[in-house]
Amino acid sequence: IARRQRQMCIRDRIYPIGIQNFESLRLDGYFYIDKTALIYQLVKSGRYYFLSRPRRFGKSLLISTLEAYFQGKKELFQGLAMEKLEKDWTKYPILHIDLNTQKYDSPQSLESKLNRTLVTWEKLYGSEPAEDSLSMRFEGTIQRAYEQTGQRVVILVDEYDKPMLQAIGNKELQNSFRETLKAFYGALKSKDGCIKFAMLTGVTKFGKVSVFSDLNNLDDISMWNEYIELCGISEKEIHKNLETELHEFADVQKMTYDSFCEKLRQYYDGYHFTHNSIGMYNPFSLLNAFKRKEFGSYWFETGTPTYLVELLKRHHYNLERMAHEETNAQVLNSIDSESTSPIPVIYQSGYLTIKGYDEEFGIYHLGFPNKEVEEGFIQFLVPYYTSMNNVESPFEIQKFVREIRSGDYNSFFQRLQSFFADTTYAVSYAHLTLPTSDLV
């Protein structure tokens, strides 16, 4: 694998856009930024972890990489830091739960998903008639996997919060999901002696009566500086791995190298997960931009945050606050169905990020992470708060820009007056700024 990777011409580099399986990525010669030294540190310094990151930030690939590592697949790590760090390459039984593959609109939908997962495991390790609940079956599976293999079990959970996110606004359904998942994950505590390692990932962290409230040994590394680079791409990693491509991309854009790097930073950098962390680039948008050699709102093209709009409307949130929101760590890190603020969901979903920190009062200053998110989110919101539909919205914005560039200020102000006449107060005075630097 390492030889194949070295032989690949840079111009033939295949970007792993949408590739979430580590084995496929390595065998098929996809480009990979080596995160395995951090993964090794993670595995060797603890046992139970939780990590929240925005969607399309590499969480599923992280889980898949951990799976390959605990399966002892040394050949997949040739040429990576892990090859030299790990000496034993022990194979462990792995229980992998992926909750990202289903729509959850009823208590039965979650129970059905968990049941299908358990059935798959029970075909490998057996079952007992007395295990008459999902949580008891999970406990039994962990116990038998340990006894039959002689190795403690690895638990990997991808997108643990998908059911909870889909139930935002439905208190009864969210409580049902919470109780089901809390009981299910409770097996991790009761079978602690049988477990080697557990990693749970998601977009959000739900507070109050959390699904993890019984797991007092679960380390939430979402705001730990030492693991900031575990998901996403840092500027240092870009220059180390993509320096030639940076110059090629700049040439295609007919820009100087320095001005191009600054534009790339403005569009896709800016995610801060602690008050003093380095900025991280959105990997999905960044790799798409390198593949196509053009700037675009790639993250927004993959899905729109409709649940966020419902939150904003239900809480009558004044969007003017969004570009300079302030909150504390307790609010920032927990979400529940009765919350009076949409900010935790917006932050944890990646539409806001940490811009500053007031150490005296423990207050975080939030804002849009970058230009892609700011422009995409505002453009996405316009149809929900005005009479324009999704098709009209981008064309109206283009008309604003063209009228300014051509000096047709009368048409511009007439259109602006009409726009705000159809706009609710919540968005009328919001941070709807035209990119004036691009107009002249």
Predicted stretch roles:
Residues 11-429:
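Phosphate-binding site recognition
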Residues 1-10, 431-440:
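Single conserved hydrophobic/aromatic residue that forms the stacking wall/gate
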